[in-house]
Regions:
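N-terminal auxiliary segments of SAM/dcSAM-dependent transferases
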Residues: 24-32, 38-121
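Class I SAM-dependent methyltransferase Rossmann-like catalytic core
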Residues: 121-156
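Active-site catalytic pocket residues across diverse enzymes, especially alpha/beta-hydrolases
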Residues: 153, 157, 183, 207-210
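Conserved class I S-adenosyl-L-methionine
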Residues: 160-171
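Conserved SAM-binding loop of SAM-dependent methyltransferases across substrates and taxa
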Residues: 172-186
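S-adenosyl-L-methionine
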Residues: 201-230
Length: 232
């Protein structure tokens, strides 16, 4: 059953000034009274444009207009949930002891090849094995560096709680999840990754660990073929 989006938006805009927007209530005001679960899905899709965030109880409230405060970014490791997402793909391809034996040797060799390619300023190409090697080599340092790059924005009050991000050449996702973890829980992000290589498979697994208000879309195409206007 579909939802009349115009009626949904009008109802949500009215209720936001009164109380949290609850799909269990909103459906009663809509034509054909669609199931609350359908209304919730539609609200999630409309949340960014409405300026809403979803709470743990499934209701929606306006996003604060206050800029993001400095979170005191000092990571000591790549968070376990993202590390596991990469490790699961390694186990799927090579088995539980992926870091030893022939598979471990091949991964280390691919890392050395990637480093040599970077050093020469050449363009790297990524098949599945290279993507996994890339994730192993760059995961932690790219994660940490991204947060430090955001600090100057928060120092100046320039990082809003509602963000639309276009990440061209998104790689295996460390910068994306660093942004997710850097932001407060009441932030809302519409994140679009442009990644044509096998890195996108690792990226998809890592992004699956992000929260409900970090909406993600992966565009598996080249930067040249991608239309930035398509993301709104």
């Amino acid at each position: 059953m579909s939802v009349d989006r115009e009626s949904l938006r009008e109802t949500a805009k009215y209720l936001q000034n009164v109380r949290p927007v609850d799909p269990e209530e909103v459906y009663e005001y809509l034509p054909s009274q669609p199931h609350p679960a359908v209304v919730r899905r539609a609200l999630r899709e409309e949340a960014f444009s409405l300026g809403f965030r979803e709470r743990e109880d499934g209701s929606f409230v306006p996003i604060s207009e206050d800029p993001v405060d400095q979170p005191g970014w000092e990571p000591t490791q790549y968070p376990p949930q993202y590390d596991r997402a990469v490790a699961d793909r390694l186990v799927e391809r090579y088995g539980r002891d992926w870091e030893t034996g022939e598979s471990g040797h091949r991964l280390r060799e691919r890392i050395r090849e990637l480093k040599e390619t970077y050093y020469r300023g050449e363009q790297a190409s990524y098949d599945e094995e290279a993507a996994l090697a890339y994730a192993i080599y760059h995961g932690a340092d790219f994660y940490a560096a991204t947060g430090y790059a955001l600090d100057p924005l928060t120092e100046r009050g320039l990082l809003p709680r509602r963000l639309r991000v276009l990440d061209v050449g998104a790689g295996t996702g460390s910068p994306a999840v660093a942004l997710h973890d850097y932001l407060p829980e009441d932030a809302v992000v519409d994140y679009h990754a442009v990644e044509p290589s096998a890195n996108a498979d690792v990226l998809e697994a890592v992004l699956a660990e992000t929260g409900r208000n970090f909406r993600t879309t992966i565009h598996r195409t080249t930067a040249e073929a991608f239309d930035p206007g398509s993301v709104g």
